[in-house]
Amino acid sequence: MYYKTGDVCRKIFNVDGFDFQLRVKKRAYSVEIVVLDQEGNSIDGLLVSDENDLYTALDILKQSIYEWIENNTDEQDRLINLVMKW
């Protein structure tokens, strides 16, 4: 196999101007997906064992990200991100 059990892949991604980190870890029979904020705090995480689980997990993680944005940012933060899109 390409990835060994225990391997961790990381990726920075952006939602509405806010940066998050995606951490994916291969386990024996599943993949652990965790979304982290800029400080490395876990926002949400799930175990996925097949493609059907993946699509459900992605919907749940997106919802968690939008909840985090709502609870951890203010109007000025959102305005700054809108301006920075120019």
Located regions from the model:
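Mixed-charge, Lys/Arg-enriched low-complexity segments
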Residues: 2-3, 39-86
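Amphipathic, interaction-prone secondary-structure segments
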Residues: 5-36
